[in-house]
Swiss-Prot record:
The modification Phosphoserine is found at residue 716. Residues 1-60, 723-748 are annotated as: Disordered. SUPFAM superfamilies: WD40 repeat-like. This is 2-deoxy-glucose resistant protein 2.
Amino acid sequence: MFKSKTSTLSYDETPNSNEGDRNATPVNPKEKSQTKHLNIPGDRSRHSSIADSKRSSSRYDGGYSADIIPAQLRFIDNIDYGTRLRKTLHRNSVVSNGYNKLSENDRWYFDLFDRKYFENYLEEPTYIKIFKKKEGLEQFDRMFLAQELKIPDVYKSTTYQGEPAVANSELFKNSICCCTFSHDGKYMVIGCKDGSLHLWKVINSPVKRSEMGRSEKSVSASRANSLKIQRHLASISSHNGSISSNDLKPSDQFEGPSKQLHLYAPVFYSDVFRVFMEHALDILDANWSKNGFLITASMDKTAKLWHPERKYSLKTFVHPDFVTSAIFFPNDDRFIITGCLDHRCRLWSILDNEVSYAFDCKDLITSLTLSPPGGEYTIIGTFNGYIYVLLTHGLKFVSSFHVSDKSTQGTTKNSFHPSSEYGKVQHGPRITGLQCFFSKVDKNLRLIVTTNDSKIQIFDLNEKKPLELFKGFQSGSSRHRGQFLMMKNEPVVFTGSDDHWFYTWKMQSFNLSAEMNCTAPHRKKRLSGSMSLKGLLRIVSNKSTNDECLTETSNQSSSHTFTNSSKNVLQTQTVGSQAIKNNHYISFHAHNSPVTCASIAPDVAIKNLSLSNDLIFELTSQYFKEMGQNYSESKETCDNKPNHPVTETGGFSSNLSNVVNNVGTILITTDSQGLIRVFRTDILPEIRKKIIEKFHEYNLFHLEAAGKINNHNNDSILENRMDERSSTEDNEFSTTPPSNTHNSRPSHDFCELHPNNSPVISGMPSRASAIFKNSIFNKSNGSFISLKSRSESTSSTVFGPHDIPRVSTTYPKLKCDVCNGSNFECASKNPIAGGDSGFTCADCGTILNNFR
């Protein structure tokens, strides 16, 4: 299990409970860490500062510690993974008829790990402590560390023959500069400061997941053998050849496969898929094409073309200076666009290996992006804070502005260089990241600009005006890139930070125009702080009194409606002439070093992961499937039910086809020490409670069954008790007829499973059955019934975790003579019935001899 070394908070802790703690610690430790961890060239105390921050993290972070380990589970036996899987699947095929609507594909993983270990984890989960400032995003609730990947120190470039790196760079030779996923979601590429390029593959099949478990087990065994040999050699040298048994015993963490822990919810294979070593210096950018090719930009003045299935680069594009950006043309990946420090943006033809078009922007190019969806426009960011918009075809100039100079913003004049028009040259801030997205509200292109002055801004490229400003994170010399993503239909912007934290904001300007168009002009009542605009519009749309307003809004040809909407636009522009300052972020302490990159797994990567029997996906999808079945059944009987039982709680959707919602958020962060951390959202609290309840039923059932089997005198004792209970029930039900058959059931909770090949002794009354739930999560639709019989042999029966009695069947035409119950189950080959099928009462256990 994972637990923070300094935090013992539960998953449902709210920021209000730690308000005083957080108010005392959020500013001071961050300001202090920022002065420590700025990447100052030539600062030889950098390494010691990191060590000091690690030692003092638990003292100053107020419980927001990054000293965490990935969540792990323990397997239950010593047989290999494949054998255990085959045995479990075989047993499921045998007992599958004993389950009512329980998915056979979602039961096998309960046999793969220690249920007690997993139950302890479910009862006491310890999630990442997240700081929420004024508002939170449910997509990042219940976050835990799922996996850690490390860039090894052994990789060194063999092609670079230039001058050695400075001492400060050697401390961060494994620093990760870029991280991105392929379009098919199969690979994640990592570009490092030492020029190495690493490809990690997403787990996409159950077989590969099992192979991953076996490889981890073999590594553990080899480490145990190595430790045994070392102790053997040490004992020979210290004891003159005398060896004791304790000397050959490995440590407790390598005692064998039964003690081996495995990751709870890994995303990538533990071993890197491929490593490319052709770049000599820092890899600054990497981009995937729609056909699976990869282009990288490096400080060695080259851009290289790769493919995951090839061991070497396919082509090299030489530049006169550092290549800071490289990107594929979306509609045709035979062309790439690169940005260089020689002020020129180039469009290359890969087949011809030559420059087709070029544009000189008179400034150092530090970032580059294309407009969605077809890359019609090319947007360039420069060292001094200028933005250039070009037509991709021919790289023709369209417009430009400066991110902080308001005199260049919101103008209709599109000068070639803003400084030539206004007579001054701006110096900074440096643009470190760009991302363009299309606004479906006003049909305009919007640009996310990240600068090294710790700001992320959103610009409307049509008006060249800032719409929103995100603040809170810390940026120095790192190439932080604020990224926009729609998560559960909510616009989110996220980034890493030099203060070791991860930050994310909910975009407030995304639906700005939609709010202006949808707001009723005659409503003068102001919005309350507890009611959002979406919620107010939803209430208004549901009321019949607003039909006239809705009609006017939908009729675009009406002059009256157009006049009102124009007034709203003018009023909103007057109020919102300045950019929205958004500091309502949520964050958590992700690393003990500056966080260089942050990326959220795309939908295609999550879908690939769901194909590998991912535990979180299997449990969540099974839960919503059964909850949906219960709702559909209840809806048939009660059509006017106001509330839907399956809600989108914690960011998960009840739609079974929505695989992404069932898996949850997968966040990847990297730092300057070469560490890759994978964070995930855990299963819902409702799912945890259901699994814990089912585990308790399993444990009680098997404990009671095992105790009765091991007792040699148990059969005779039970026979006497059953005889006494049978006579008591005869007297009771003969005098007072029961009004409810459910209330007449005996109080016995559990019973043993009757094997199919075990004969039933004549004259032995059947014991009442146990009431089990229909499946892991939903409520019971009936009782699981089994016969309590005595076998002629004295051999004991071993119960598996899924050896549950069969489901009872209701026969309305039959009636019990003892309890007047109508629930019966079929007992095949009953000797009392002459070898034919017989029936027993599910309520009192009486054998029915009359079948008329």
